[in-house]
């Protein structure tokens, strides 16, 4: 299990349908999706929305055929801009599930509002990164 400092991705999605490390994706709704090269990255949780407070969510990587993509080592970070202040930052815990291309994240959003988070990876699909901008309710 790896812990990554996040520039505040603290609490994204409440994941239902996870038993142990195994994730049942059919119980989850997409909250955000982005294509990067030949990869599609989908963030999933039970409601499909980001909420203030403690949350769990799933990050899924898929190849250009829609199949699970093992991208190797994945890191996550998040931040929330604060007027006249330094951005909020915090920690998130990212855990591989043992299922190709599927990772669980436990995080806590301290406040509602506009959050920015980054995912980076290094492995069979090379090195890459992307940024998601999400509204936490």
Which residues are covered by each model-predicted region?
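Contiguous segments within soluble domain cores/interaction surfaces
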Residues: 19-112, 116, 120-137
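Bacterial N-terminal signal peptides that target proteins for export
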Residues: 1-7
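C-terminal motif of bacterial Sec signal peptides marking the signal peptidase cleavage site
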Residues: 14-17
């Amino acid at each position: 299990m790896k812990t990554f400092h996040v520039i505040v991705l603290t609490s994204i999605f409440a994941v239902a349908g996870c038993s142990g490390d195994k994730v049942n994706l059919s119980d989850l709704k997409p909250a955000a999706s982005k294509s990067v090269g030949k990869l599609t990255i989908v963030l999933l949780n039970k409601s499909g929305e980001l909420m203030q407070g403690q949350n769990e969510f799933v990050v899924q990587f898929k190849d250009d055929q829609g199949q699970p993509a093992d991208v190797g080592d994945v890191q996550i970070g998040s931040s929330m801009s604060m007027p006249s202040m330094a951005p909020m930052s915090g920690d998130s815990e990212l855990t591989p599930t043992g299922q190709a291309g599927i990772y669980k994240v436990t995080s806590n959003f301290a406040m509602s509002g506009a959050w920015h988070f980054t995912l980076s990876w290094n492995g069979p699909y090379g090195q890459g990164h992307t940024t998601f901008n999400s509204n936490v309710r």
